[in-house]
Amino acid sequence: MVSVSEIRKAQRAEGPATILAIGTANPANCVEQSTYPDFYFRITNSEHKIELKQKFQRMCDKSMINRRYMYLTEEILKENPSVCEYMAPSLDARQDMVVVEVPRLGKEAAVKAIKEWGQPKSKITHLIFCTTSGVDMPGADYQLTKLLGLRPYVKRYMMYQQGCFAGGTVLRLAKDLAENNKGARVLVVCSEVTAVTFRGPSDTHLDSLVGQALFGDGAAALIVGSDPLPEIEKPIFEMVWTAQTIAPDSEGAIDGHLREAGLTFHLLKDVPAIVSKNIDKALVEAFQPLGISDYNSIFWIAHPGGPAILDQVEQKLALKPEKMKATREVLSEYGNMSSACVLFILDEMRRKSIQNGLKTTGEGLEWGVLFGFGPGLTIETVVLHSVVI
């Protein structure tokens, strides 16, 4: 008779979870940050709020964002005036948009990832879907399974309302699934659409205005599995270690509430300080076992919640400016796409590493870190090992 320990041993993969493919997608509607204040105040019938518009213009100018992509076009917003008001009951209109668009955009990214992976979609064993944009039953995971034509017995995991740290969360979960289920191939999808958070400006709630200056739409998809098939699957990054922690004394620093007016976010001004204060401890826990204490010797992927967070982390750790190059590039070209951001940065980094003729997918370096920051204040940490190009 076979023992439980023998069964468990046979169920486990031998090697670490590995990212085998990455795909990304954005809505067709591209919004230039330089002209966005004019559009935003016009479409929300707020052009009379001259001082507030000037404040918003300064926010956009300081955001380090050049452009964003948004599902919400002028035509859609004109058809849904309640979405343009500040805190007007509008949840039905928002939900009707995102329950369709979130899985659709996710499919676009997933198709690209599956194509790069090069294996038939019938080999996908697990699906992790993550979004902070809208809620429905059956969920976006079910809708994506139908859209892609995946097998009905794919094991699905649906993560709603996690926020900006969740790009790290999906990697942590995918790692555990791949390493504990021999032969598993996990499709990971993060899809975010700002139709749930868009609203007009308010003189009394400037933190809402910050979100209007930063958030953009995007979806990213990965294929994750252990023990890649030689000559068939091409590893991009290995995931070696993960952690999640709640920063001390950070309650209320970032929170979101889904109500009749849609999803509202509240940010305290000291969010960058809280992140930078706690990042050193997270790094020590992650890299001390590897004998690494020079954080300029590793590659960096950090959720770009905004330029102030990146600036303070750089300052706290005395990081060289080039360490955050891939992160800042994604912020500049796409804005803050919540959970999808860090996956876009993974893609950006491996592409630039190949283009620049570097030795590894991690900017020529062996080890790296991926950080997610979000409501809680929650910090996700993933230790990555690059792959020789």
From Swiss-Prot:
Aminoacyl-tRNA synthetase is among the record's keywords: no
E.C. number(s) listed in UniProt: 2.3.1.74
Gene Ontology annotations of biological process type: flavonoid biosynthetic process; polyketide biosynthetic process
Source domain of life: Eukaryota
Keyword annotations from UniProtKB, A to Z: Acyltransferase, Flavonoid biosynthesis, Transferase
Pathway: Secondary metabolite biosynthesis; flavonoid biosynthesis
Pfam families: Chal_sti_synt_C (PF02797), Chal_sti_synt_N (PF00195)
Active site: 164
Coiled-coil blocks: none
PROSITE patterns: CHALCONE_SYNTH (PS00441)
Catalytic activity: (E)-4-coumaroyl-CoA + 3 malonyl-CoA + 3 H(+) = 2',4,4',6'-tetrahydroxychalcone + 3 CO2 + 4 CoA
Gene Ontology MF annotations: naringenin-chalcone synthase activity
Protein family: Belongs to the thiolase-like superfamily. Chalcone/stilbene synthases family.
Function as written in the Swiss-Prot or TrEMBL entry: The primary product of this enzyme is 4,2',4',6'-tetrahydroxychalcone (also termed naringenin-chalcone or chalcone) which can under specific conditions spontaneously isomerize into naringenin.
The protein, known as: Chalcone synthase 4
Organism: Pisum sativum
Gene of this entry: CHS4
